[in-house]
């Protein structure tokens, strides 16, 4: 494990793998770098890339989250990019895609963006998240109810209440639930203006000029397919790709070759 100090003094923990073009993995809501899937993706890419797999602030071995802020997460990525000679591609998973987008929009030295199923709510027929999601989430975080915040999140991605109750009994959920206080970072990165069933606006993303690959699974939720298409339409330099047979929980064996080819121009076998 390595650490780098972000602009506000927060220590950001990361693991480094391999040699080649640099790619930083930006995990989604509740995730952390030691989650098995993230480690498998990092290992799979390491044959052809220098891979940085990090704990977003407030998670895992990184320092405390502090008040939710897009700017702080962008600063964290800026510090990580400096560890790989000042330029890197970013791979974002789910809401991590929004963090990666904000970093590119802010002018960081981002070579390429590969984004998997950023969960913007662009479909007017989508039921989740509910319009009061952020308000309730803020209250739970203010009360330091991390598990409550995590359960609230799961209900607002469409998980039935009975399944949420069962999930909360699974030991692994405790690790995810411990990151419940960071969920507002994800929501702010997505942007409240992008979470109420309207198309994404091109002007919001006009400064994201780097080559961008927007990927979604053929078996994912219709709302995530809709969001991926809307994102590709809004970005100035994007390619849209459907990944056959994949759901939102993408398999490393399916996504690693896609990232490797896009970032490094290499044929990668996961």
Annotate each language-model stretch with its function.
Residues 35-37, 62-67, 125-126, 225-226:
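Conserved catalytic-core motifs of eukaryotic protein kinase domains, centered on the activation segment
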Residues 236-270:
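Catalytic active-site module of serine/aspartate enzymes centered on a nucleophile-bearing elbow/loop
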Residues 43, 52-89:
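Active-site loop/oxyanion-hole signature of alpha/beta-hydrolase fold enzymes
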Residues 118, 122-177, 186-194:
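Helix-rich cap/lid subdomain of alpha/beta-hydrolase
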Residues 175-233, 242, 250-252:
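Conserved serine/cysteine hydrolase catalytic core
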Residues 55-59, 119, 244-246:
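Short beta-to-alpha linker loops that shape the active-site pocket of alpha/beta-hydrolase fold enzymes
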Residues 3-63:
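Conserved HGGG/HGGXW glycine-rich cap/lid loop of the alpha/beta-hydrolase fold
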Residues 87-124:
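Conserved hydrolase catalytic core segment
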């Amino acid at each position: 494990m390595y650490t780098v100090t972000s602009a506000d003094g927060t220590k950001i923990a990361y693991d480094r793998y391999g040699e080649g073009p640099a790619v930083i993995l930006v995990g989604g809501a509740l995730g952390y770098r030691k989650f098995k899937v993230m480690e498998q993706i990092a290992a799979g890419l390491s044959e052809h890339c220098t891979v940085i797999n990090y704990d977003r602030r407030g998670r895992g071995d990184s320092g405390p989250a502090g008040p939710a802020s897009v700017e702080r997460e962008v600063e964290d990525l800026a510090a990580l990019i400096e560890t790989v000679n000042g330029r890197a591609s970013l791979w974002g998973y789910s809401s991590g895609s929004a963090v990666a987008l904000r970093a590119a929009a802010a002018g960081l030295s981002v070579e390429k963006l590969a984004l998997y199923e950023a969960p913007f709510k662009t479909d007017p027929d989508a039921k989740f998240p509910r319009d009061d999601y952020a308000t309730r989430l803020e209250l739970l975080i203010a009360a330091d109810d991390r598990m409550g915040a995590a359960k609230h999140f799961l209900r607002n991605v469409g998980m039935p209440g009975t399944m949420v109750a069962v999930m909360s009994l699974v030991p692994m959920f405790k690790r995810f639930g411990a990151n419940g206080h960071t969920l507002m970072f994800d929501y702010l990165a997505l942007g409240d203006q992008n979470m109420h069933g309207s198309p994404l606006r091109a002007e919001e993303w006009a400064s994201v000029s780097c080559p961008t690959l927007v990927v979604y699974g053929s078996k994912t939720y219709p709302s995530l397919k809709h969001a991926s298409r809307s994102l590709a339409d809004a970005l100035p330099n994007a390619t849209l790709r459907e990944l056959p047979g994949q759901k939102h929980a993408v398999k490393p064996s399916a996504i690693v070759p896609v990232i490797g080819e896009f970032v490094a121009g290499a044929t990668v076998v996961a």
